């Protein structure tokens, strides 16, 4: 067992990366003290865990968009149209899209689209099946990246034929690249 550290280590030392091997007693950090057993001594010693790798693993860039609501937040029937857009401040990679309609469409599926600078990101558009509230998860991306400065727009391209569906929330799961 090694000697105790010669200096006191503070939380700010850990955050700003000023803790070095001289500050740690031998064997002070072990897998027994780490709850996630996927982190092993071999991975740490072999350089498999780095600050860059850890930072890249947490660059989630998720966002949501609401359609089919009035100015007071009450549900209104969806119509076929563009509902709005946003300007991306950074490069992203799309991972998934989720859709949920407060009122399910009936008679026909509700179909929505997300476009980059006017071009769809899908080869198979996301759908909420007639009688369902959540999307069927059968969409297929044709494009998975977008760049800083791109205009991301949200569209409804088909509504239910008996009941249009209303209160559509679309969540985009993405990562900063």
Please identify what each model-predicted range represents.
Residues 9, 14, 44, 49, ...:
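Hydrophobic beta-strand residues in large extracellular and virion-surface proteins
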Residues 18, 92, 147-150:
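Surface-exposed loop/turn positions
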Residues 22-25, 32, 43, 49, ...:
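Secondary-structure boundary/capping motif
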Residues 100-148:
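Terminal beta-strand-rich extracellular "head" domains
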Residues 56-111, 161-177:
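Beta-sheet-rich sandwich/jelly-roll-like modules and their strand-loop junctions
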Residues 154-162:
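Short beta-strand-plus-loop segments that form exposed binding edges in beta-rich domains
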Residues 1-62:
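Fibrous stalk/shaft segments of extracellular and virion attachment machinery
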């Amino acid at each position: 067992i090694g000697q105790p550290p010669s200096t006191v280590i503070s939380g700010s030392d850990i955050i700003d990366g000023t803790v070095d091997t001289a500050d740690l007693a031998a064997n002070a950090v072990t897998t027994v003290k780490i709850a996630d057993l996927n982190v092993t001594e071999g991975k740490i010693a072999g350089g498999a865990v780095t600050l860059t790798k850890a930072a890249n693993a947490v660059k989630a860039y998720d966002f949501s968009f609401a359609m089919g609501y009035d100015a007071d937040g009450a549900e209104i029937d969806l119509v076929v149209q563009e509902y709005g857009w946003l300007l991306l401040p950074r490069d992203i990679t799309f991972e998934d899209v989720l859709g949920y309609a407060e009122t399910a469409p009936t008679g026909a599926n509700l179909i929505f689209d997300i476009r980059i600078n006017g071009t769809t990101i899908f080869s198979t558009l996301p759908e909420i099946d007639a009688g369902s509230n959540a999307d069927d998860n059968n969409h297929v991306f044709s494009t998975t990246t977008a760049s800083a400065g791109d205009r991301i727009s949200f569209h409804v391209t088909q509504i239910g034929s008996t009941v249009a569906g209303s209160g559509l929330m679309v969540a985009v799961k993405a990562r900063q690249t």
